[in-house]
């Protein structure tokens, strides 16, 4: 029970409860935690509460009144929203609060936290002036230590301590203010990978934001064993500035034999205790994570031994009884089970695809064959996806071995047929772990000898080596490494001694936690299965997407060169059209659709220059294999695209040409214009029988605003292109010192690109159409810039970025915002604008866009195959009606939590679309905005 003098100020408030249980919970909250006493009880429906021995007559009236009270569901939702935004938003900006004055905030914080109530402290947890919590009715209760409610320079409420004591890890005042405050250590181990620096940056800033101390352990386990301030360094917020753009790991990594022995782990334990570290976050491969989990399991015996040998005190022993461990996978091979992607894998894939794109030019010039060796000792993910993204002629990976004679015959057969059809170049990708089915390794020189001796090709070998590891991370790795770093901090703060060590994973495009031991065991089973020649089990342990990519590569690689897999009566005529603005991956979709159709026996058609090209010029061409060779690596749209809709182009003429060519299915590739086009075609079916065919939309737009999907082709290419642009701009701002750039972002009414670019580029502020720009927010942001630049005196990397979506505000344009900032800066810093414009569409598509375009296109063709016969039954029906069965044949193919699904256009158009704003109704990236603001130190109103 707190003292009666704990707080005062507000004289009288009335609160309504919807039921008896919440009424009683509220009474318990105010009496047990805040020191109120029941002064009056009227029929168990009205209670008067008053502070005990209070001179200011502070009273609360609690009334059971379902009519005036918020509903139970509303109260629960409000409490969930506040709890979820505890570390992300200032509660004062979310709802109004009931305010009290208190002379003992530290005591109040301890009482509330001991009772399990969420507590938000402002401006920080070290020296709070205001404290906020939530009562059982969802009311926001505030407590201020200010005598003057408008004061900003009140003395610190921390107990006075000596300077020496203030720097001790076991400082009593810190314990009083935050009894569960942790000290987190973060390290990188094993092979380096792009994205490790963004991960460490996220851990440091998220940890500091949540009131923790964070130590970076340099040189991996080697630094942990050696210890001392040289290897284990406390890291501040500004220390990790600029790390997003840097490749590798700035805190170093090294393999450590000593840590494999118990004596080495004992030293590591002692060093961690000396620094006060009670939680460890490790980013590395399966070996590094296995070592971390073993370290945790031995921790009780290690500290017991340290106590027995008097290397630590009894107090240290009591304080560090448990060690929380959390792992994240940093590996370019993408060889960890239980996660869809490891940190650095897509960056490495990007390096490989760029290198092969460059090699293509010289190979084509000299009509040569190139053997390209890529990394992947036990995992062929890099080789497989690189082969799919670059349309390689043949790949050799560990998961699909064959006898020496078999792979040689198969490779020569495919390459020979490609050459006979007129292809001038040959690319064969060999994973470093490629083997034949007798487990003998397959070297690049062996492959070269086969091509030279059997086909007489001028052949060269290129080993990419460590080029695959180097360089800055791509947007995907920056974003997801950052999200994993934040989640790792949450994990070590939430786990207890009984919780199995978690590993942060990406499953279904969501950041999740999986048991670390289970993930490592599954990963090691793959290598064991390959060693025991159980190749079916090895590939079954890979995720389903890996198997699908394998099948897709085999199908597209054999296009038009082997007998079709479908009988004659099952073969169709399938058309593809691009609609809307160009987007990375459009050509890849056309290439994959056409080659897959050829392998199945279908006839692929391309409609050139959109619906206007079809209606005005009958721009329909059947697709020839050699004509589209190399399209997978090209940006833009080779068949042409525009924004003309079917109704505007003459839908009657479009239907006529569909009838003339006898199309059995149509694939649309494009953005919101393609979405509207699909809707118009589906509605016109009642008048035009030729449109009663399966219709599939593959979303492709940099805005990622198409309803029915969380990913559109071109958005990843756009993010990478815009990120590279911002990296250069930020470098200029940092070199100039005291400069902020306001960069305009495309995306229409969608803030997807601006939000994710803020996370990938480290921009301090982003403005998006979903939120708009209020004058209050702009004023707060400018004040934040002033403080940032004032604190930057003498520091490097002092440039700042502000991202502004083009439609965030029609009044506060990019130029206007820059001018306002310049004026408010009063010469302390300056502001410039940068408008990249259509540069954001990107040039060569990213590997992710290429691979997903292939997957989308093949799924779309398969959908047409499944539904074509059904459509034939009602195609010429006089009594045609739009039943659910019929409407389900006009669909949007999209990704929802990494699962591909087909959603009827009618459902999406009627219920999930904001057509006037050209947007989807559900905004799925709002949590990313909160994390972006948290890591940039921005307060969002």
From Swiss-Prot:
What residues does beta-D-fructose 2,6-bisphosphate 1 bind to? 739, 832
Q: Which gene encodes it?
A: PFK2
Q: Where does beta-D-fructose 6-phosphate 1 bind?
A: 368, 460
GO BP terms, alphabetized:
canonical glycolysis; fructose 1,6-bisphosphate metabolic process; fructose 6-phosphate metabolic process
Associated pathway: Carbohydrate degradation; glycolysis; D-glyceraldehyde 3-phosphate and glycerone phosphate from D-glucose: step 3/4
Descriptive protein name: ATP-dependent 6-phosphofructokinase subunit beta
Q: Which Pfam families match?
A: PFK
Q: Could you read off the lineage of the organism from its UniProt record?
A: Eukaryota, Fungi, Dikarya, Ascomycota, Saccharomycotina
What UniProt keywords are attached to this protein's entry?
Allosteric enzyme, ATP-binding, Cytoplasm, Glycolysis, Kinase, Magnesium, Metal-binding, Nucleotide-binding, Transferase
- List, in alphabetical order, the Gene Ontology terms for molecular function in this entry: 6-phosphofructokinase activity; AMP binding; ATP binding; fructose-6-phosphate binding; identical protein binding; metal ion binding; monosaccharide binding
Q: How is its activity regulated?
A: Allosterically activated by ADP, AMP, or fructose 2,6-bisphosphate, and allosterically inhibited by ATP or citrate.
Known catalysed reaction(s)?
A: beta-D-fructose 6-phosphate + ATP = beta-D-fructose 1,6-bisphosphate + ADP + H(+)
Q: What does this protein do?
A: Catalyzes the phosphorylation of D-fructose 6-phosphate to fructose 1,6-bisphosphate by ATP, the first committing step of glycolysis.
The entry's family comment says: Belongs to the phosphofructokinase type A (PFKA) family. ATP-dependent PFK group I subfamily. Eukaryotic two domain clade 'E' sub-subfamily.
Q: Where does ATP 2 bind?
A: 395, 400-405, 410, 557-558
- Name the positions where beta-D-fructose 2,6-bisphosphate 2 binds: 643, 701-705, 746-748, 806, 838-841, 918
**Residues that hold Mg(2+) according to the record:** 286
- Using the UniProt record, give the first listed, main subcellular location: cytoplasm
Region annotation (N-terminal catalytic PFK domain 1) ranges: 2-558
């Amino acid at each position: 029970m707190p003292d009666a003098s704990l707080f005062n100020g507000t004289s009288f408030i009335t609160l309504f409860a919807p039921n008896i249980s919440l009424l009683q919970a509220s009474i318990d909250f105010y009496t047990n935690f805040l020191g109120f006493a029941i002064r009056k009880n009227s029929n168990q429906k009205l209670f008067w509460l008053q502070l005990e021995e209070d001179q200011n007559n502070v009273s609360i009236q609690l009334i059971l009144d379902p009519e005036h009270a918020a509903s139970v569901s509303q109260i629960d939702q409000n409490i969930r929203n506040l709890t979820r935004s505890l570390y992300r938003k200032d509660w004062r900006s979310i709802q109004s609060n009931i305010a009290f004055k208190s002379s003992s905030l530290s005591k109040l914080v301890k009482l509330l936290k001991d009772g399990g109530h969420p507590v938000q402290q402002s401006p920080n947890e070290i020296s709070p002036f205001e404290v906020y919590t939530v009562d059982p009715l969802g009311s926001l209760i505030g407590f201020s230590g200010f005598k003057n409610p408008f004061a900003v320079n009140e003395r610190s409420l921390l107990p006075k301590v000596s300077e020496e004591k203030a720097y001790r890890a076991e400082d009593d005042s810190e314990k009083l203010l935050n009894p569960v405050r942790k000290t987190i250590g973060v390290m990188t181990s094993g092979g380096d990978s792009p994205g490790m620096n963004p991960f460490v940056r996220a851990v440091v800033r998220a940890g500091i934001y949540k009131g923790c101390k964070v130590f970076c352990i340099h040189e991996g386990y080697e630094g942990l064993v050696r210890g001392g301030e040289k290897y284990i360094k406390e890291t501040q917020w500004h220390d990790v500035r600029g790390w997003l753009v840097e490749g590798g790991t700035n805190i170093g990594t090294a393999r450590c034999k000593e840590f494999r022995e118990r004596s080495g782990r004992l030293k590591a334990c002692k060093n961690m205790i000396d620094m006060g570290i009670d939680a460890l976050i490790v980013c590395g491969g399966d070996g590094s994570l296995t070592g971390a989990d073993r370290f945790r399991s031995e921790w009780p015996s290690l500290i017991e031994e340290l106590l027995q040998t008097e290397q630590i005190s009894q107090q240290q022993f009591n304080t560090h009884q448990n060690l929380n461990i959390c792992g994240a996978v940093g590996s370019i091979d993408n060889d960890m089970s239980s996660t869809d992607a490891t940190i650095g894998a897509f960056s490495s894939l990007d390096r490989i695809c760029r290198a092969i794109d460059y090699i293509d030019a010289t190979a084509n010039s000299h009509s040569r064959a190139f053997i390209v060796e890529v990394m992947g000792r036990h995992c062929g993910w890099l080789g497989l996806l690189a082969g799919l993204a670059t349309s390689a002629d043949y790949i050799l990976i560990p998961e699909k071995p064959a006898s020496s004679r078999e792979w040689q015959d198969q490779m020569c057969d495919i390459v020979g047929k490609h050459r006979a059809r007129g292809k001038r170049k040959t690319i064969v990708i060999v994973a470093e772990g490629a083997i034949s089915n007798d487990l003998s390794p397959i070297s690049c020189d062996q492959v070269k000898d086969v091509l030279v001796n059997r086909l007489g090709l001028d052949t060269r070998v290129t080993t990419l080596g460590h080029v695959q590891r180097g360089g800055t991370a791509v947007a995907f790795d920056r974003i997801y490494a950052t999200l994993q770093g934040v989640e790792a901090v949450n994990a070590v703060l939430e786990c207890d001694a009984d919780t199995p060590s978690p590993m942060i994973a990406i499953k279904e495009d969501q950041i999740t936690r999986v048991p670390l031991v289970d993930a490592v065991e599954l990963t090691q089973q793959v290598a064991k299965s390959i060693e025991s020649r159980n190749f079916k089990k090895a590939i079954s342990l890979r995720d389903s997407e890996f198997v699908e990519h394998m099948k897709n590569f085999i199908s597209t690689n054999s296009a038009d060169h082997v007998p079709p897999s479908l009988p004659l009566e099952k073969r169709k005529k399938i058309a593809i059209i691009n609609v809307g603005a160009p987007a990375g991956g459009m050509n890849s979709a056309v290439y994959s659709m056409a080659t897959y159709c050829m392998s199945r026996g279908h006839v692929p058609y391309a409609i050139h220059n959109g619906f206007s090209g079809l209606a005005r010029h009958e721009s329909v061409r059947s697709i020839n294999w050699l004509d589209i060779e190399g399209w997978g690596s090209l940006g833009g749209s080779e068949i042409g695209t525009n924004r003309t809709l079917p109704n505007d182009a003459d839908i009657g003429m479009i239907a006529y040409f569909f009838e003339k060519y006898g199309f059995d299915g149509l694939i649309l590739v494009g953005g919101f214009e393609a979405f509207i086009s699909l809707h118009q075609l589906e509605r016109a079916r009642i008048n035009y029988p030729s449109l009663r065919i399966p219709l599939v939309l593959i979303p492709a737009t940099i805005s990622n605003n198409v309803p029915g999907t969380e990913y559109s082709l071109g958005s990843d290419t756009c993010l990478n292109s815009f990120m590279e642009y911002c990296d250069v701009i930020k470098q200029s701002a940092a070199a100039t010192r005291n400069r902020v750039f306001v960069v305009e972002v495309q995306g229409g009414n969608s803030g997807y690109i601006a939000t994710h670019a803020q996370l990938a580029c480290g921009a301090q502020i982003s403005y998006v159409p979903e939120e708009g720009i209020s004058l209050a927010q702009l004023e707060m942001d400018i004040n934040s810039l002033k403080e940032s630049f004032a604190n930057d005196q003498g520091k490097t990397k002092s440039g700042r970025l502000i991202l502004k979506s083009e439609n965030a505000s029609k009044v506060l344009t990019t130029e206007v915002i820059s001018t306002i900032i310049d004026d408010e800066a009063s010469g302390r810093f300056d502001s410039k604008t940068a408008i990249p414009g259509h540069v954001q569409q990107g040039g060569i598509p990213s590997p992710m866009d290429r691979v997903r375009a292939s997957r989308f296109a093949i799924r779309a063709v398969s959908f047409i195959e499944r539904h074509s016969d059904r459509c034939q039954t009602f195609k010429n029906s006089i009594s045609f009606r739009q039943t659910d069965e019929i409407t389900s044949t006009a669909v949007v193919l999209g990704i929802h939590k990494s699962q591909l699904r087909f959603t009827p256009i009618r459902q999406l158009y009627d219920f999930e679309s904001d057509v006037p704003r050209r947007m989807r109704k559900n905004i799925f990236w709002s949590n990313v905005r909160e994390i972006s603001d948290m890591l940039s130190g921005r307060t969002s109103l």
